[in-house]
UniProtKB/Swiss-Prot annotation:
Record's keyword terms, sorted: Glycosyltransferase, Signal, Transferase
EC number: 2.4.1.-
The protein's name: Ecdysteroid UDP-glucosyltransferase
Gene Ontology terms for molecular function: UDP-glycosyltransferase activity
Length: 528
């Protein structure tokens, strides 16, 4: 009899455990969703940010399909995730991207430096056509043609170009989360109804000068910003024409697709964007790729070189997008003269051939930058000013000398100078003496490290980490979609056109009435 009671108890417990497990599975299935992520820019630094975000969503149990454009990042190589990450490899566009950058007139001065004149609708449309060609690759095209076989609940796209928003239409009216790997552009903020443009407080990202400007130079920069805006005014129409040619006449316009964007993630700390006033639908993250990252021990020749750098070491890298073969010989010779005269050991990320190399210089085509910056003997970082590089320098408390070369790097390094974290030089005009002076000042003065410590403490002193914030807000959009309710994050000004935003329907009639009234008065006077 007792044996029967034990058997009955075991059966009851097994049933309860099975029921509990079934409930957990049902709850998990109820909240886990399928996500489509489209990242069409084949830049390593961009994908290193997106990978952390995608893995975190998979860790929460969501299934993610990633259309990726580089073979240097593998989104599906981590075991133990609760969800699943699968890839559609469109990395053939990487060669296209390199060719586009070479032929777009971007790298002009000293072989590697772009100026604001290269930010044109023509060059932007080159990037859009690259994406269009990417979406025509057989593997991507087949995936699109079988859209009826796939059910997705959310689309994640890279911010700054809106062409990939078309996937929200192709796969069934999906809500969209846009994420930038660094700063967002003015058009992204306009989509969200945030403050987007101001020549002083929220200037154009593509400018190369920001401080020490007299009234005349400031006026010229304002004019440049206006020309940039006017140059791109017809850009959405060109994208619309391409969309309809590629995906059919029923394809919504870019302006219509922007209405589906529920959330914008900006992967910089808000202070670097002048603490821009934004609605809740815009969330600043910052250093997403450094989540839970700790420096690993280094071994081999790099470790030995750094350990022996008793007078200090300087790390020199111009990022993953710059090839040494593009540098003009004059620029390389200038750098070599600087290295020879510096009283430090130099580690230089350089992938070209060199006839001579100073004895104090150690060259490799690739360094584990994050680990290297944490070595106790590293005194300064000579950098192009990319967002991920400056994030790593802040985390390692290494002051910077900026030599901006393209994109948002001049803007980013201007903020580094404003915050007292380093110095910046004019990459086009700098000579050896000026660069030596900047490096020695940054390496020797304690004020830069003091400000770096203060800033690092401030950006760490947050209620949640950047990755936790990204996941929480993403799941808020998902939950709103599931419950068929608005996210309540967006402002009424989201994606409003300029004429409505400035209330032209109010002041234009008023101006016309005033002008007509003055004309009437003049006519009366003439008649008298």
């Amino acid at each position: 009899m007792g044996h029967l009671h034990i058997v009955h108890w075991r059966l009851t417990m097994n049933g309860a455990i099975a029921a509990l497990f079934l409930c957990l599975v049902m709850v998990h299935q109820q909240h886990a969703v399928r996500i489509l992520a489209v990242f069409p820019t084949p830049a390593y630094s961009h994908h290193s940010v997106f990978k952390v975000y995608i893995e975190a969503l998979a860790e929460r149990g969501h299934d993610v399909v990633v259309i990726k454009s580089t073979d240097r990042i593998n989104y599906a190589n981590r075991n133990g995730l609760r969800g699943n990450v699968s890839e559609i490899d469109a990395s053939l566009s990487q060669e296209y991207y390199g060719r586009l950058m070479r032929h777009a007139g971007v790298f002009r001065k000293r072989g590697i430096v772009a100026d604001s004149s290269t930010v044109t609708a023509h060059n932007y449309m080159g990037l859009v056509r690259m994406m269009s060609d990417q979406f025509d690759l057989p593997i991507v095209k087949s995936f699109i043609e079988e859209a009826h076989k796939h059910k997705f609940d959310l689309l994640i796209t890279e911010a700054y170009i809106d062409y990939p928003l078309v996937f929200s239409h192709l796969f069934g009216d999906l809500p969209v989360v846009q994420i930038s790997s660094g700063y967002a552009v003015a058009e992204n903020f306009e989509t969200m109804g945030a403050v987007s443009r101001h020549p002083v407080y929220y200037p154009n990202l593509w400018r190369d000068k920001f401080s020490g400007l007299n009234v005349w130079k400031q006026s010229m920069k304002c004019t440049l910003s206006w020309r940039y805006r006017m140059n791109l005014v017809n850009w959405p129409d060109e994208q619309n024409a391409l969309l309809k040619r590629q995906f059919g006449e029923s394809t919504p316009t870019i302006q219509e697709l922007r209405n589906r964007v529920e959330l914008l993630f900006v992967n910089t700390h808000a202070i670097f964007d002048n603490n821009r006033p934004v609605p809740p639908s815009v969330q600043y993250l910052g250093a997403l790729h450094l989540h839970d990252k700790r420096p690993d021990s280094m071994y081999g020749m790099v470790r030995e070189f750094l350990d022996n750098a008793t007078t200090g070491a300087i790390y020199v890298s111009f990022g993953s997008a710059i090839s040494s073969e593009d540098m003009e010989p004059e620029f390389i010779e200038m750098l070599l003269r600087v290295f020879e005269k510096l009283p430090y050991s130099i580690l230089w990320k350089y992938d070209g051939y060199m006839n001579r190399m100073p004895a104090n210089v150690f060259v490799q085509s690739w360094f584990e930058q994050y680990n290297l910056l944490h070595h106790k003997n590293v005194r300064a970082f000579v950098t192009q000013g990319g967002v991920q590089s400056t994030d790593e320098a802040v985390e390692a408390i290494v002051p910077m000398v900026g030599m901006p070369m393209m994109g948002d790097q001049a803007y980013n390094m201007n903020k580094i100078v404003e915050l007292g974290l380093g110095k910046v030089v004019d990459t086009v005009r700098v000579n050896a003496e000026q660069l030596i002076e900047a490096i020695v000042d940054v390496a020797e003065s304690p004020k830069y490290r003091k400000r770096l410590r203060e800033l690092r403490h401030m950006i760490h002193h947050q209620p949640m980490t950047p990755l936790q914030k990204a996941v929480w807000y993403t799941e808020h959009v998902i939950e709103s979609r599931r419950r068929v309710v608005p996210t309540m994050l967006k402002t009424r000004a989201a994606n409003v056109n300029y004429s409505d935003y400035i209330m032209s329907y109010v002041f234009v009639p008023f101006i016309m009435f005033t002008v007509m009234n003055h004309l009437r008065q003049l006519l009366k006077m003439n008649m008298v």
